[in-house]
Each structure stands twice: as structure tokens, then as C-alpha cells.
Amino acid sequence: MRDMADRAQGRLLLYQITAPMLDLAIGMGLEIIKYGEEAVVDLSAFTLDTPRLRSVRKAERAVARKGAEFRIVPAAAVPVIMDELARVSDEWVRAKRHEEKGFSLGRFDRDYLRHFDIALVLIDGRIVAFANLWLTADRSEASVDLMRQVDAAPPGTMDFLFVHLLQWAQARGYRRFTLGIAPLSGIEGRRLAPAWAKAAALVFRHGERFYGFRGLRAYKEKYAPEWEPRYIAGPHGLGMLKALRDLSRLVGRPMVEASSPHLALPARPARGDGGADRPPTPPPAANNAAAAETAGVAA
């Protein structure tokens, strides 16, 4: 990988890697920094009948009383509802007053979404929220990528969607459901910690107004997940800062030209027929969207 990066005149950055990958990254001479924590729900033990999920249970029932319905549309039928999905997405983008992101954050793309089963929330026959599904072929894991809802959706609509998705995946034998990353979560800025750790901990504690990181973690915490650390591995010193800058540009500028010498955009996976393999680590797209109700975080 380092040779490939050198030949492309780029900087190697391993993004959102798991703990088992750390030995490999260290052996490659890369610097390791903690990026955040991923929320994972063990579906074998998932139940709404627990005090920890009381707020989720209450929100789901409130939306159900408004006539909400949950439905899964198979990938083959998604083109039929694509215009409706676009309407929901456009309304969501306008309400959030920001542009679409990209790379590891989901963005509305018709050619991409048509490859995936789509979960819907409908009220009076009209789509008020949706998410595309990432499902492993061996049913070891399920997750979502892009999540959108209309501005007039009842409070708790995303909870309604998540509850039914968890139950749907559980009933089909999936072992775990990934709620995505909480960036900067679990990083301790102790006195002897590296400067990056101190800065990350400071942003997590005091940057809620601008970034919503604490609200994002709090939203996911409602589902009583296990938190698994995720890391970034890259060049030492100034090279790491430059690589992180490149990463930020990839996420914030999804339509960057492919001719850029350092920012070659990989294609998002083209398969997703309900049983297709998904990338090894899900990006935080849905993660951010799911927290939109409580934290105002963009996806």
C-alpha cells in the first residue's frame, strides 16, 4: 500500500481501522491516532423491554400512533420510488442548509441507491424517511448508509426507523447492527497525552455548538450499544496533518476532480442487492443523519 501511495505521489492514510489492524499499521511505520468509537448492537440480545431503551420505546410508539408504517423495498423496485426519495432528500438538504458531503459520508446518488434495498417510513402512504441498507452475505452484520427525512416528519421518526430496522435484521438472523461512528468519542486528553488527543478531547467536550459530537454519541447510546474503538493510521508529523487535510477535503468536496494528484476518489460500492458484501467498516453517513433530530449533525 505504501508503494502504491508513493507511485501515485500521495500520502497513505488508513481510515477507521479496527484494533486487529493496528499491528499491521505499526509494522508499516505509520502513526496511530484514535478517530472515535463505533456503536454496535448485539442483535442476539436486543430487546425493547429494558429500562435503557425506555426513551426509544416511547418515541417509536408515539410515531406509530400517527399512523407510521415501516417497509423494505427491494433493490429491483427502488427505481419506481426514486423520485420520491429525491424529494425527501432535497427537502432534508434544504432544511439543513448545507451541501452534500461525500467519500465516507453518504450522499444522494440515484445510480448508487438503485443497488440497495431501501427502508421506508410512510405516513398516509407518503414517504417521510428512508435509509439504504448495507447487509453482509453471511448475515454477520447489518447497517445503513444514507438516511434522510422530511422536515415535517414527527419527532422520533428516526427512532421508529431504527427500531424496526433492528427488529427486521434480528428476525432474519443478522448477528449485529452497526449504528456507525461517534467521532472523537472515547479520546482522553490527559496531561501526558499527545497534543492531538488533547485537542480532540477538547473539541468533543466543548465543540457541541459547531460539531454536535456529544449529541451524536448520546443519540446512539440510547440503543445500549457496545462501543468499539476506531483508528486512523498515517504518516508521522506534518505528513499526518496533510493527510487529514486531504481526508477533510474528500469528505467535504465529493465532486473534486479526479485529476487532482492527491485526491483520487474511489468509487462507492456498486453492489447491494440485499445480500451483497458491504465494505469492511461502514462510513459514518447514517451515523450523522440519525443524530440530526437531536444534534443537528449533517450527513
Model regions and ranges:
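Residue-identity detector for glycine
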Residues: 272-275, 296
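Long, low-complexity, intrinsically disordered segments
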Residues: 283-299
